[in-house]
């Protein structure tokens, strides 16, 4: 018995949509990484050092973004199951009107 009106199918659909968007973002980051590696050959001297420093910052930021995407996707995946279990446990303690 559920006491609250949660749209569990919507949570599952949101997780699927988020996974697709996260995959697209990871792909875009990967493409940017490849483009940067190709562009690195055109830099020389101080320009090369500056480019490498900027590229290192980009790689670090991309790693953080990927970690956050993983966390968000895992949280969405657990949300429906956790909600259903907690709601069912709380519903059994409800005595009625």
From Swiss-Prot:
Keywords from the UniProt entry: Acetylation, Secreted, Virulence
Main localisation: secreted
A GO cellular component annotation in the UniProt record: cytosol
Modification N-acetylserine, positions: 2
Localization in the cell: Secreted
The keyword Disulfide bond appears for this protein: no
InterPro entries: ESAT-6-like_sf, T7SS_ESAT-6-like
Gene3D superfamilies: ESAT-6-like (1.10.287.1060)
Oligomeric form and interacting partners: Forms a tight 1:1 complex with EsxH.
Its job: EsxG, in complex with EsxH, disrupts ESCRT function and impairs host phagosome maturation, thereby promoting intracellular bacterial growth. The complex acts by interacting, via EsxH, with the host hepatocyte growth factor-regulated tyrosine kinase substrate (HGS/HRS), a component of the ESCRT machinery. EsxG stabilizes EsxH in the host cytosol.
Family membership noted in the UniProt record: Belongs to the WXG100 family. CFP-10 subfamily.
Note: To improve expression in E.coli the proteins were cloned as a single protein in the order esxH-esxG with a cleavable thrombin tag.
Name of the protein: ESAT-6-like protein EsxG
């Amino acid at each position: 018995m559920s006491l609250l009106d949660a749209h569990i199918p919507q949570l599952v659909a949101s997780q699927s949509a988020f996974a697709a968007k996260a995959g697209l973002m990871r792909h875009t980051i990967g493409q940017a990484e490849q483009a940067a590696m190709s562009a690195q050959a055109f830099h020389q001297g101080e320009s090369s050092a500056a480019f490498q420093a900027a590229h290192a910052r980009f790689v670090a930021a991309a790693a953080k973004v990927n970690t956050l995407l993983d966390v968000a996707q895992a949280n969405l995946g657990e949300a429906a199951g956790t909600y259903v279990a907690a709601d069912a446990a709380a519903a059994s303690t409800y005595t009625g009107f």
